A protein has these predicted regions:
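C-terminal catalytic domains of large/alpha subunits in multi-subunit enzymes
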Residues: 1-54, 62-64, 68-200
Length: 200
């Protein structure tokens, strides 16, 4: 939403700031990911930021997603995720990194794959044969950095999950000019968004 408002206001997406720590993770992730670099046609970068869980002690997270979109099939290939996380003092670096890697990949799964189908009030996905989570072959390159901080430690349960889908959605927009606003972002949804863009 911030990216869309920023574009409407004529500013860069990562210029839509807020708290100092949010502005810091946004600036750092943009620099780390090479925000603004030239990409081939059909590819795009999207940026997003979140904070959570407790308002008194939030974890600030920013993410840049790099995608390639096939305009014919609607297939989205997630090439890379870059995340910068400010969770205060990191007590156990290896554990923190593992937590953020897992959280980010869960975010990818929710953004591009997982979604329950219903028909006549009944769940259609009764086993993993029909319910498709993220698989090893779909795992993108991950680059995660923690902000060095003297603040007290904060949570790392889900912050890296929540930032991924909006970054991917913004990257799809950057690649195609089409907005997809519902999850999961499957090829059919991308094709509908592309068709809607052409009608506008």
């Amino acid at each position: 939403m911030l990216t869309a408002r920023g574009i409407n206001a004529g500013s860069e997406p990562n210029a839509v700031g807020g708290a100092k720590r949010m502005a810091n993770v946004l600036a750092r992730v943009a620099e780390k990911a090479g925000w603004g670099k030239s990409l081939p046609e059909g590819e795009g970068m999207g940026i997003a930021c979140t904070f959570g869980q407790e308002r008194a002690a939030p974890t600030w997270t920013a993410c840049v997603a790099e995608v390639a979109v096939d305009n014919e099939s609607g297939e989205v290939t997630l090439n890379k995720l870059t995340l910068v996380v400010d969770a205060g003092s990191i007590v156990h670096p290896d554990g923190a990194l593992a937590q953020c890697e897992g959280a980010a990949l869960w975010g990818v799964s929710l953004a591009l794959h997982e979604g329950t189908e219903f028909a006549a009030g009944q769940v259609q996905d009764t086993n993993l044969g029909g319910y498709r989570p993220l698989r090893m072959g779909d795992v993108p390159e991950l680059e995660i950095e923690f902000v060095e901080s003297a603040h007290h430690p904060m949570g790392l349960g889900e912050p890296a999950t929540t930032v991924v889908a909006p970054a991917i959605g913004n990257a799809i927009y950057a690649a195609t000019g089409a907005r997809v606003r519902h999850l999961p972002i499957r090829p059919d949804a991308v094709k509908v968004a592309l068709a809607d863009r052409q009608k506008a």
